[in-house]
């Protein structure tokens, strides 16, 4: 993990074979560099740009892949955030503290969903609400699925997000929710198949977060 030059390595068997994009750098030193950059500079615009697909790549923390691959721990990260709060100047505290608190709440949210799959691992392959089993899987359209994966649905915003994700291995949370809900409701694709593809694509794939959100955005909870 610590010696990796990319997150994850392009030859990782779990990653789709035709990956040809450019993912963020990995490694311990890179994890420390980007969190320092976030806490000292970028966090001041965190909430304002959190959901913007064009700006989130810069203003989000971008630490999620490092948490996934273990180049920084949650305990260490929380300590760095709390230290930053304590050392804010009076001027910084006016706006920065709110952004830091929002970031901390999302770290707590991450832990919550990881615990959720620990308590109920079946959510990886079973609908949380059993009534919705067989809702979509029996009418799966392979052509729709391929077009969605490749960013060729004909819906410009959806396709742009998918192509960006395929290239970078990362996209902001709101856009993840959008591409999943589009696949589930507009294309009527089963969440298990779209979810597996996304799990192969996200460099910060974390099963607990992934499957809980996938099911909620597909309306099977």
Model-predicted regions and their roles:
Residues 14, 56-59, 78, 136-142, ...:
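Short acidic (Asp/Glu) and glycine-rich catalytic loops that position anionic groups and cofactors
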Residues 83, 109, 167, 184-189, ...:
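Short, well-ordered loop/turn and helix-capping segments at boundaries between secondary-structure elements
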Residues 132, 136-139, 186, 197-221:
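C-terminal, helix-dominated tail/subdomain
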Residues 118-130, 190-198, 210-213:
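Short acidic alpha-helical/loop segments enriched in Asp/Glu that coordinate divalent cations
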Residues 61-64, 102, 143-146, 156-166, ...:
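Contiguous, well-ordered alpha-helical segments that form the cores/surfaces of helical PPI scaffolds
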Residues 1-130:
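Glycine/tryptophan-enriched, flexible segments
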